[in-house]
Amino acid sequence: CSTEILSLSPASLREMALESLPPWPDDMVLSGTNEHGQKILHEGEFVIALYEAMPATIDVAIPYTYDEYVLVLEGSVVLTSTEGVRQEYQTGDQFLVPQGWTGTWEMPGRFRELIIVETDQWEASDSLLAALFASPPKAGSSAPAVLPLLANTLQQAELDSLPPWPEGVVITGTNAHGQKVLHEGQLVSVLYGAEAALLEVGAPFPYDEYVFVVEGEVFLTSKGGSPKTFGVWDSFLVPEVW
């Protein structure tokens, strides 16, 4: 797989052509148009894909088999859990649907999203139809809830201090940073913050890292390459071994 930074510009992602998917089974579509498509953008430790659906309400009666991170690129969606918890997300919002979730997805207009799913789970399902083949929930298990990841809330969240970077990592600036773990499952979702600094990434990245910028900006320069700039609302992927 590529070792280059993958820019995920919302404007480009909204215009990208997708490949048609087989229709959902009829009993899953409560109302609307049974038409959708996807495009895989990256496949490494996790899969990044674009997904689009026409206006419809989808019944997810069988539990999700995987954690799914979602960034809404176009349209809006109303998620209502089997327990009756209703959440609405608009363009630019993010959320995480946890493994085991059930409920309905209501998409009042054309809906496009960027999604991230752990690769082994994606390959086991081979498509977004994975939820159809899940095992039923265990009796007495608590219902998992969708985790909102709204930028205005994340900007205000308190972080836990991290130990300073080792000597030699910080070229200039302040060696102070912190994080807060928001979700730990098949995917780990973490809020990270740092003071102004220039860091040297001398050892290759040990993992794929998807980044959504909620405050400030960052300049990434590959060895021998030109800098790439990302600001608030931008997202990108730092691939393993970068």
Question: At which residue positions do the language-model features occur?
Answer:
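Threonine-centered tandem repeat motifs in low-complexity domains
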Residues: S12, S31-T33, T80, E88, ...
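Residue-level recognition of conserved beta-strand positions in structured domain cores
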Residues: L50, Y64, E74, S81-T82, ...
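Ligand-binding loop in jelly-roll beta-barrel domains
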Residues: R86, T91, Q99-A124, G231-V232, ...
